[in-house]
């Protein structure tokens, strides 16, 4: 995004001193997010049970958004050098968590970038399908699918009661 602003300023002959303030305005606006109604409570429940990492192709800042306390790590494609669905960014996140990729559940809302990408990289995939879309890949099916983050937290509570002790370790 910064490079796009820089290019636009150069092409228009504008003052390049505007680059930093313009990017800061964009970045501040980018980090003003509206949470889904279930997101905060569910994220708190999940993070209390499991180590959670944020993996993003975007440039959101968990500190600015106010969610950093729920995540052990934040991995962004720009810093990593590759983006989802490339396997290396999923693998790097697993390494940061110290968890074998076969034991990591990647939760995402984009069928290809998140779920299929994670599964091709050797992780388990959970599709957060809030809009009721139809899965289109006949060769690969998500391990789990939920319409809300609360449903995932409920599933973890019901099926994985031993995980709370692991999260504290």
Predicted regions located by residue number:
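Conserved donor sugar-nucleotide recognition element shared by glycan-biosynthetic enzymes
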Residues: 1, 35, 86
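A metal-dependent, Asp-based hydrolase signature
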Residues: 1-24
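Alpha-helix C-capping/helix-to-loop hinge sites
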Residues: 8-12, 29, 77-78
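Asp-based, Mg2+/Mn2+-dependent phosphohydrolase catalytic module
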Residues: 14-16, 40, 44, 48-169
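Surface-exposed cleft-lining segments at the edges of enzyme active sites
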Residues: 24-32
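Active-site periphery "cap/insert" segments of enzyme catalytic domains
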Residues: 32-38
